[in-house]
């Protein structure tokens, strides 16, 4: 669920999804288009692609099992959908942590109209 994804992001980056990631670049937040702006935005692009593989699942609201221990996120057992959504969220949160050194405040609340270039495909 979105709330669980927010907790994973906070665990990995020490930043809240809102405001730091909800409207970042061209892909973080709802939807996405054109070319990712940087490594952080690319994490969101890959997360969107991961969700596209599970379109029959309720990616925004399905509650899944996971734990945050010893610096790691571990997804638990559940339905196929819940396990896949958890993995998408876990991988994205870890990606955002790895991208912290290149995070740019200037890409927060980035207007869609400034997203340029051809859209990438998953």
Swiss-Prot record:
Pre-incubation with heparin markedly reduces the neurotoxicity of this toxin. Binds 1 Ca(2+) ion. Pfam families: Phospholip_A2_1. The active site is at residues 47, 89. It is an enzyme of class 3 (hydrolase). Snake venom phospholipase A2 (PLA2) that produces neuromuscular blockade in chick biventer cervicis preparations in the absence and presence of crotapotin. In contrast, in mouse phrenic nerve-diaphragm preparations, the neuromuscular blockade is dependent on crotapotin. PLA2 catalyzes the calcium-dependent hydrolysis of the 2-acyl groups in 3-sn-phosphoglycerides. This is Basic phospholipase A2 F16. The lineage of its organism: Eukaryota, Metazoa, Chordata, Craniata, Vertebrata.
């Amino acid at each position: 669920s979105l709330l669980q994804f927010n907790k994973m992001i906070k665990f990995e980056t020490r930043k809240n999804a809102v405001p730091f990631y909800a409207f970042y670049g061209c892909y973080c937040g709802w939807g996405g288009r054109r070319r990712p702006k940087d490594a952080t935005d690319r994490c969101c692009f890959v997360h969107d692609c991961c969700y596209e593989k599970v379109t029959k699942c309720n990616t925004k609201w399905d509650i899944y099992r996971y734990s945050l221990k010893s610096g790691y996120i571990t997804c638990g057992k559940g339905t196929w959908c819940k396990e896949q959504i958890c993995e998408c969220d876990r991988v994205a949160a870890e990606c955002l942590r790895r991208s912290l050194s290149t995070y740019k405040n200037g890409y927060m609340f980035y207007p869609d109209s400034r997203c340029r270039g051809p859209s990438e495909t998953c």
